[in-house]
Amino acid sequence: MKTVVILAGLVALALSSAVPPPKYQHHYKTSPVDAIFVEKQKKVFSLFKNVNQLDYEAEYYKIGKDYDVEANIDNYSNKKVVEDFLLLYRTGFMPKGFEFSIFYERMREEAIALFELFYYAKDFETFYKTASFARVHVNEGMFLYAYYIAVIQRMDTNGLVLPAPYEVYPQYFTNMEVLFKVDRIKMQDGFLNKDLAAYYGMYHENDNYVFYANYSNSLSYPNEEERIAYFYEDIGLNSYYYYFHMHLPFWWNSEKYGPFKERRGEIYYYFYQQLIARYYLERLTNGLGEIPEFSWYSPVKTGYYPMLYGSYYPFAQRPNYYDIHNDKNYEQIRFLDMFEMTFLQYLQKGHFKAFDKEINFHDVKAVNFVGNYWQANADLYNEEVTKLYQRSYEINARHVLGAAPKPFNKYSFIPSALDFYQTSLRDPVFYQLYDRIINYINEFKQYLQPYNQNDLHFVGVKISDVKVDKLATYFEYYDFDVSNSVFVSKKDIKNFPYGYKVRQPRLNHKPFSVSIGVKSDVAVDAVFKIFLGPKYDSNGFPIPLAKNWNKFYELDWFVHKVMPGQNHIVRQSSDFLFFKEDSLPMSEIYKLLDEGKIPSDMSNSSDTLPQRLMLPRGTKDGYPFQLFVFVYPYQAVPKEMEPFKSIVPDSKPFGYPFDRPVHPEYFKQPNMHFEDVHVYHEGEQFPYKFNVPFYVPQKVEV
């Protein structure tokens, strides 16, 4: 046999011919909209195009260039907000071209002032004019941050579609190696040597240049963490985290802006507990074991080299065994340690009393205070001290673990992955930090009375059977547009002839259904919950439920009316509540708008996880998990919370019945069922085998 060395680019070329069309071209759920909605939507979209430069012929520029905020002060419902903004703006706002991060004090102060200016505009026209003014005159990153939140939070923009963050900020979702290739093609005006281009995974397809992209390797993850780089760097997962912040920023004051004050801290805990549980499942199937722990007084073992760049500087790098306890961090380390110890002292006392609050830690509602404490959000303090975010545990921890030097001034800093919600999930130490926070909150959970048999029992209702289709994951190619990363000429900005797309394999799963047999003695509205949890730990030993309760990941919640006798309920994975379809590209949304339609999930469920990440990547022989199905009586939310049923679906705690430590003997009741399942993986186990790096020739036996 002779060995033929085949260039990886040619392998990629062969693979590209077998790539199925992106699935967004088929069967995407849409909703009809009227002409007024379409006009609003197109105006909102126009401000996202080529965000790093201005179009002097665009409508927004003509409006924003000369718009006078002060002269229009009567068009804002809160005049003090306008005055506060103008005071900051005239003393000097953040210049254009600088990197923006909400985790730095002066930038945060300006961004909140800008958001409030957007938020208190009396009508959509004033909002659009104000946003146009900011698009022209304000720092690009700050504008986008405030604009995203305002579109989500304003009543007159409710339901409008926002572009996927990875289209707006490609530099935060794509390694610099790929964007360098994009810039090269742009600078060469599309000139391509076909042989050389194939070698580097670059192709011209129709009106687009397509760039094959791997996930980061051991250069970025100098440890075994590269095994799940496809998870860390998934553009849908990172967008999900960004949207979570957009819907409920840590600086958000519920008294001032809106709802959820009574459950805000609970939402914080539930979000991170579920994110860590989902991450843990991915670690198990990849043989990475338990989530590592760290100490503020010892080197951090897990290094990370982001391979990302900001406006002027590359992202900071953290080597393995990074010594965080150094002279630039002493003060922050002391604060972080004191913050943790103070919380444990509160728990030992059993109560907290300060900031006009008195909390009993034996009360289940205390979770709201505990979540607020760890987020250090605006609802924790009274009105006089709501801006004490510099005393935030999260912000200080991100700065210490990010390993960046101290900022040069209020606007100049070396960015780290932990400085942005769009990039935080790429850094493995992020999960170690939030696992640490969740473990502290679980210390509080130990003070809660576990559910007893009567709490969990459903009189007259029994789950007789649960059947689950084969669970199988696979990797598939997906294209996403990175055209916003390039600068274009004045001539081309109106109608640039080409688009730039990155093609990358992403984790997905085959559709499946869960069939539930229920025998009932009564006719009643019942809630069904489906969870996925580990059955064995990283060493292969069964995990007792008493130690495993907070590792169950909630897949679905739905209400079904059961009738006397035998009931057969089939739930399709595509209908699971906590997931959505992937975002459509802006180019596809424009086509839908011309037909009077919008993508339903992008309009209604932007803050949920993509369906394709529902299951952890399986293994060839099937990785064992357990599916938990639970049915209980439905209790509607209070009337005042009905508009928010998508977030607060019923009156039970988030994650119920796994919202507190459990007594396993009470989880063997007729209205509960544990079903052993296996998650298989079909095709290549590791996505980098789809796109072999160009610098590694492949040997093929002939």
UniProtKB/Swiss-Prot annotation:
The lineage of its organism: Eukaryota, Metazoa, Ecdysozoa, Arthropoda, Hexapoda. Its main location: secreted. The keyword Secreted applies. PROSITE patterns: HEMOCYANIN_1, HEMOCYANIN_2. PANTHER family: FAT-BODY PROTEIN 1-RELATED (PTHR11511:SF5), LARVAL STORAGE PROTEIN/PHENOLOXIDASE (PTHR11511). One of its GO terms (molecular function) is nutrient reservoir activity. InterPro entries: Di-copper_centre_dom_sf, Hemocyanin/hexamerin, Hemocyanin/hexamerin_mid_dom, Hemocyanin_C, Hemocyanin_C_sf, Hemocyanin_N, Hemocyanin_N_sf, Ig_E-set. The keyword NADP does not apply. Residues 1-16 form the signal peptide. Fat body. This is Arylphorin subunit alpha. Glycans are attached at N75, N214. Arylphorin is a larval storage protein (LSP) which may serve as a storage protein used primarily as a source of aromatic amino acids for protein synthesis during metamorphosis. It is a constituent of the sclerotizing system of the cuticle, and serves as a carrier for ecdysteroid hormone. Belongs to the hemocyanin family. GO terms for cellular component: extracellular region. Arylphorin is a hexamer of subunits alpha and beta. Pfam families: Hemocyanin_C (PF03723), Hemocyanin_M (PF00372), Hemocyanin_N (PF03722). It comes from the Eukaryota. Gene3D superfamilies: Di-copper center containing domain from catechol oxidase, Hemocyanin, C-terminal domain, Hemocyanin, N-terminal domain. It is found in: Secreted, Extracellular space. Keywords: Glycoprotein, Secreted, Signal, Storage protein.
